[in-house]
């Protein structure tokens, strides 16, 4: 689903988790009740682990700008190729009377805001009158948004660490507390019945990334 930086090496257990996640995702497309979203959740946790590992290895010397460039170079060529190919195929074989719906979803896909677009639509599965060919990219959008803001948060922690000399254990506690707070917030919105926002919002998925971190 998402390629990771190979500079931290290959971890067999993580590769195994990816395999399990892919299996769950494939099976859920045949049976919607089969561990619903479980595979995507695993990918979020794995992404949180890898990004935390990449950043923590460099510590205070970590460059946010270089990280953004490396992530864009790694992810966007695949995204652009896929979305442009689908765009061309739709112009040839698609329902042109619904081109407005398609174009809006295309813009959301290439801008990595598909999840926000779906929240605006107000339905977990988007517009029921139009099959959104880019719907699976909502998870990519959540991951990309996490890549934007999470490095900034870690950079701030590392900067504070220069003055307060936080031990690795205390930094670990900070991540644990942040994960718990994020999960409590997620459960609060879940109980309030905000199904669409709860499903697609990067904030409701934050605890999964932090759990991996």
Language model region names:
Residues 1-213:
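Membrane-interface helix/loop caps of multi-pass membrane proteins
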């Amino acid at each position: 689903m998402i390629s990771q930086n190979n500079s931290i090496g290959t971890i067999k257990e993580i590769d195994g988790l990816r395999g399990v996640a892919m299996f769950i995702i494939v099976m859920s497309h045949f049976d919607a009740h089969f561990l619903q979203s479980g595979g995507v959740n695993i990918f979020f946790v794995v992404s949180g682990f890898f990004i935390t590992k990449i950043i923590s290895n460099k510590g205070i010397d970590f460059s946010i700008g270089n990280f953004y460039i490396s992530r864009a170079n790694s992810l966007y060529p695949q995204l652009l190729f896929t979305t442009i190919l689908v765009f061309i195929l739709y112009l040839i074989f698609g329902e042109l009377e619904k081109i407005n719906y398609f174009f809006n979803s295309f813009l959301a896909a290439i801008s990595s805001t598909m999840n926000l677009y779906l929240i605006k639509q107000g339905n977990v599965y988007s517009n029921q009158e139009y099959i959104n060919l880019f719907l699976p990219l909502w998870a990519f959008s959540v991951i990309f948004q996490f890549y934007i803001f999470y490095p900034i948060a870690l950079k701030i922690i590392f900067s504070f660490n220069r003055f307060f000399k936080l031990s690795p254990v205390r930094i670990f506690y900070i991540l644990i507390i942040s994960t718990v707070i994020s999960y409590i917030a997620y459960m609060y919105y879940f109980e309030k019945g905000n199904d669409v926002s709860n499903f697609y919002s990067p904030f409701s998925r934050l605890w999964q990334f932090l759990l991996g971190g």
